[in-house]
């Protein structure tokens, strides 16, 4: 199967870190699970997580849980650079490590931190996906930039 055909079966996530959600965490996780299950029902087989705290990691954990339940799905972890999580709390670092360990593929988008590494990661995810599942609060920032990039590139966005 070529890259174009594989892209048609890939879905990525964009969303906020926990402190910027503006919605209860449990509600966000429930919405993510609903949209991921819907994407699986629509034929999506591979999910790409940008591995940030909050939406990205919760979505990755949901994908892994569904895979453990028997769904034939894969997880790609698209981390912006190695060591990205090093300044997080121990609890978030542990979650990050567990997801990375269980992923089907880990991809470091940049060799090291750079000012644009997060945007490059987000664009890479959109460029390799046919759908974006988003948790968006309307504020300026990386999530908005990712949604605008998806729109410019005609990649459909589902708001969870």
Where are these regions (language model features)?
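Acidic/glycine-enriched connector segments
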Residues: 2-160
């Amino acid at each position: 199967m070529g890259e174009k055909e594989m892209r048609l079966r890939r879905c990525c996530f964009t969303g906020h870190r926990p402190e910027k959600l503006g919605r209860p965490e449990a509600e966000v996780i429930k919405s993510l699970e609903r949209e991921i299950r819907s994407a699986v029902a629509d034929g999506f087989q591979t999910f790409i997580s940008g591995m940030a705290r909050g939406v990205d990691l919760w979505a990755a954990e949901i994908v892994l849980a569904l895979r453990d339940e028997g769904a034939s799905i894969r997880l790609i972890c698209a981390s912006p650079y190695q060591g990205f999580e090093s300044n997080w709390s121990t609890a978030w670092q542990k979650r990050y490590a567990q997801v990375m360990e269980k992923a089907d593929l880990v991809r470091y988008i940049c060799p090291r931190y750079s000012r644009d590494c997060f945007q490059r990661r987000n664009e890479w995810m959109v460029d390799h996906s046919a759908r974006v599942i988003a948790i968006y609060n309307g504020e300026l920032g990386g999530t908005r930039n990712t949604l605008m990039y998806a729109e410019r590139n005609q990649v459909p966005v589902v708001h969870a």
